[in-house]
């Protein structure tokens, strides 16, 4: 491993031990804010320092095994031990490289999940409903909570559009790779000839960042319309104009919210989604400028940015970004998404490592 990387790891180990001592001090314990901040930093350093300590022990083991190679009686055993230690060393070095990758500060946040029916009419709306159910099951398995912000139901079921907040530690970091175009190939229930139809939906995943980090939105840049709620969930309020539509004039971004009885609550929810969308657009623009020559596994949430195909007749799901095909569609639709998400995360980390080695 490069001396510069070892020096960095040594500095992190020292900081970890320093925080450990600070957390036992009375004045730190007395300050809730400082104690919370240090506890968070301590938790963030735990994995990498634990891995680094294991790596240091393996260096000692390899050194001891190499010294025994000169002893004829111990040589065979030493060779075995050295081979085993070298294998462990290789694994630990890979883990340390991944743990040293720059973290996206947004990864720890809750997120907004937006699903929109695209081409395919009623079938696309039904598929949007299937996708929402899939993500809901996945969230449930991870002990996350889903809070629907706005739902525009399809005429024959499903959704033309649904926006939900996913509440749970690291929700954005896990789901952010789901942004993009999702295509479905299946025989609709109304299809008498048994022909396969192709429909599409778009998914956008945005971090719910703290208010202080949201872009400043001038009230003069907003057009706010009220209207009567409609559809499921809206019947109990459709005698008053409690639903809200906010248009951000400079960007043309429009957000609707009609899920609450109170106009005030609907407006607050709509503003939080609007802030997240404006910030996401700014971040994406910056990332595109910085990495125009490098592929981006993070989908844009744009219809043309097709990331995945779900083929029901063949029970197949394909992720086009990494050419991954699984014949486990039933499991995926029941929310077992890790088999799709983990390979993308691994590939993303490999891209980051490649970019870092290019810099070196």
Swiss-Prot record:
GO terms assigned for molecular function: translation release factor activity, codon specific
Subcellular location: Cytoplasm
Annotated keywords: Cytoplasm, Methylation, Protein biosynthesis
A Pfam family matched in the record: PCRF
Segments for region (Disordered): 285-305
InterPro entries, A to Z: PCRF (IPR005139), Pep_chain_release_fac_I (IPR000352), Pep_chain_release_fac_I_sf (IPR045853), Prokaryotic/Mito_RF (IPR050057), RF-1 (IPR004373)
A Gene Ontology cellular-component term: cytoplasm
Membrane-crossing residue ranges in chain numbering: none
Keyword Cytoplasm among UniProt keywords: yes
PTM summary: Methylated by PrmC. Methylation increases the termination efficiency of RF1.
Modified residues (N5-methylglutamine): 235
Family: Belongs to the prokaryotic/mitochondrial release factor family.
HAMAP family named in the record: Rel_fac_1
Job of this protein: Peptide chain release factor 1 directs the termination of translation in response to the peptide chain termination codons UAG and UAA.
UniProt name for this protein: Peptide chain release factor 1
Organism of this sequence: Proteus mirabilis (strain HI4320)
